[in-house]
């Protein structure tokens, strides 16, 4: 049986996973660094890289034990090799290449974004093509997923990623880290129409997005308030999340139009939302409603596979393994790596 070992270390989670040729996740271990970074209110790259260095061996041993797998039974090793915080990417990639060399098994370099892009094929076995909204702390883009290694970016943020905006606003409100889940929790108790925030370039007519102005507007409001109690925090969180929903819903319409100009007579009309922001239940509901208006089904992975994980890396590796797309061991990890350049 084919078994792919996946390794993910592009940001602050050390993750290792093993999946089979039948898309079965035998084990999916994630060692979080949230506690280490919380005191700084964000991820510190050097701390993240050092933690990956000490965590990877532990994670690998846990995965092998949990899956009852021997290293010699691994068919190939897939590892995130960009984009991301380059220190962590190098640590994970070197670890994977060392295993590949020692075991004499193929090494497969995976683009982290491709891992997110293909997650729905792991969980729901959806066919190509489909429209993807990749929304995370580092990226926000609409992508036409036409086939393996056939990706066309329809639009992306011109400044901040949507996940970054969530984290920064959470920090302004003195909420915990990571901020996305904190904003979502507080928004449930707030009035989403209490504050009106700008929706930058919402009428641009293309699929590009902007969140920097929205973030600045929230900061300006907070600085102008004499008192910030729980009610105010909840209202700001709800109004901010509502505005994000409005922006993404509007841009989804633009993306659908651009996608349909590219794809003719597609039987399966699927839209996938992936990345950490895809775990937000409010945004899932808003975007699902918008997708249905155009006859599309919105698909999102289970919450534990929305955020960074190694199962998605292993699956992307499986697709490449099945097509004999292996990577030389002298591959150079990349801090930046466009999906269209794979």
From Swiss-Prot:
Cofactor note (record): Binds 1 Fe(2+) ion per subunit.
E.C. designation(s): 2.3.1.234
Subcellular location(s) per record: Cytoplasm
Cofactor(s) essential for the protein: Fe(2+)
PROSITE patterns with a match to the protein in the record: GLYCOPROTEASE
GO MF annotation, one: N(6)-L-threonylcarbamoyladenine synthase activity
InterPro entries: ATPase_NBD, Gcp-like_dom, KAE1/TsaD, Peptidase_M22_CS, TsaD
Principal location listed in the UniProt entry: cytoplasm
Ribosomal protein listed as a keyword: no
Assigned keywords, A-Z: Acyltransferase, Cytoplasm, Iron, Metal-binding, Transferase, tRNA processing
Residue positions binding substrate: 134-138, 167, 180, 280
GO biological process, one term: tRNA threonylcarbamoyladenosine modification
UniProt binding sites for Fe cation: 112, 116, 308
PANTHER family found in the cross-reference section: TRNA N6-ADENOSINE THREONYLCARBAMOYLTRANSFERASE, TRNA N6-ADENOSINE THREONYLCARBAMOYLTRANSFERASE, MITOCHONDRIAL
Family, as annotated: Belongs to the KAE1 / TsaD family.
UniProt xrefs under NCBIfam families: gcp_kae1 (TIGR00329), T6A_TsaD_YgjD (TIGR03723)
Protein's job: Required for the formation of a threonylcarbamoyl group on adenosine at position 37 (t(6)A37) in tRNAs that read codons beginning with adenine. Is involved in the transfer of the threonylcarbamoyl moiety of threonylcarbamoyl-AMP (TC-AMP) to the N6 group of A37, together with TsaE and TsaB. TsaD likely plays a direct catalytic role in this reaction.
Protein name per UniProt: tRNA N6-adenosine threonylcarbamoyltransferase
GN (gene name): tsaD
């Amino acid at each position: 049986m084919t078994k792919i070992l996946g390794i993910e270390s592009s940001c602050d989670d050390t993750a290792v996973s093993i999946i089979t040729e039948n898309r079965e996740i035998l084990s999916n271990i994630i060692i979080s660094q949230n506690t280490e970074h919380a005191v700084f209110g964000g991820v510190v790259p050097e701390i993240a890289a050092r933690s990956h260095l000490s965590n990877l061996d532990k994670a690998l041993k846990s995965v092998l034990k949990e899956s009852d797998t021997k290293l010699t039974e691994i068919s190939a090793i897939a590892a995130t090799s960009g984009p991301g915080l380059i220190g962590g990417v190098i640590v994970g990639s070197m670890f994977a290449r060392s295993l590949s060399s020692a075991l004499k098994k193929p090494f497969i370099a995976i683009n982290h974004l491709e891992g997110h892009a293909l997650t729905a094929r792991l969980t729901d076995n959806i066919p190509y093509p489909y429209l993807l909204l990749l929304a995370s702390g580092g990226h926000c883009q609409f992508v036409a997923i036409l086939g393996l290694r056939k990706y066309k970016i329809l639009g992306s943020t011109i400044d901040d990623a949507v996940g970054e905006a969530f984290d920064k606003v959470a920090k302004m409100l003195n909420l915990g880290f990571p901020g996305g889940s904190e904003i979502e929790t507080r928004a449930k108790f707030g009035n989403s129409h209490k504050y009106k925030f700008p929706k930058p370039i919402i009428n641009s007519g293309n699929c590009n997005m902007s969140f920097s102005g929205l973030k600045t507007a929230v900061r300006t409001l907070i600085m102008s308030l004499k008192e910030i109690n729980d009610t105010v925090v909840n209202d700001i969180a709800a109004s901010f999340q509502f505005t994000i929903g409005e922006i993404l819903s509007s841009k989804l319409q633009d993306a659908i139009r651009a996608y349909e100009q590219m794809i003719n007579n597609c039987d399966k009309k699927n839209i996938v939302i992936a990345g950490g922001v895809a775990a937000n239940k409010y945004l899932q509901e808003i975007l699902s409603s918008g997708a249905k208006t155009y006859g599309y089904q919105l698909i999102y992975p289970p919450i534990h596979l929305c955020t960074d994980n190694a199962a998605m890396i292993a699956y992307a590796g499986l697709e490449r393994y099945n097509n004999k797309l292996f990577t030389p061991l002298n591959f150079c990890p990349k801090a930046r790596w466009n999906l269209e350049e794979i």
